[in-house]
Amino acid sequence: MFATRSALFGFLAPAFLFSFAAAQQPTVASLAAPVPAQILTGQKVFISNAGYDAVSRAAFDRAHEPNRPYNDLYAAMKKWGRYELASAPADADLVFAIRFTSRIDSCDKITSYQPELELTIFDTKSHFALWTITEPVAGAMRKSTWDHNFDQGVTALMDELKVIAGTSTSGSNAKQP
């Protein structure tokens, strides 16, 4: 019985020490760089339509929705209410530039497209890009499926923006670019 307890103690003691040491290691989240202060403190945002590439333009024109990324982001931002929406860049603290692209992805002889929404946040004073969020939008053959996938992309983009804009200056909860 003494041998069993000694063996058990001999096994558990190092396991406990290693787990304690591991618990003391900084986590990835605690090492995250801070979110730029302008994103956290900004009050007014101008939403810019940064357009789309040629492939995407053709698709949006066929659907008679050439400004859909801009319109959907504008509506989502208005609904969220975190930032006041400015009518001119000069009146804003930040510019949110929305762009839609469909990168060509080639694998051997098969070519496909990878549609994505891209939101770049600019500081109006310095004109520097502070942050970029990119969210994929799954392709579709049917319009109803495309509408659903596009809405999911906008929702995912807004969810990530909310995490970034709602964090403390430590940035511990934000995904870094």
Regions found by a protein language model. Name each.
Residues A21-K79, F100-R103, T132-E135, R142, ...:
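A structural "domain/chain start" motif
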Residues F9-S19:
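Bacterial N-terminal signal peptides
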Residues Q25-P26, K79-E84, P89-S144, H148:
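Surface-exposed short loop/turn segments
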Residues G10, R62-R68, L85-P89:
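A generic short-segment signal for beta-strand/edge and adjacent turn/coil regions
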Residues A59-Y70, I110-P115, K143-V154:
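Solvent-exposed, acidic/flexible segments
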Residues M1-R5:
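N-terminal secretory signal peptides that target proteins for export/translocation
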Residues D151-G166:
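Two-component system phosphotransfer/interaction surface
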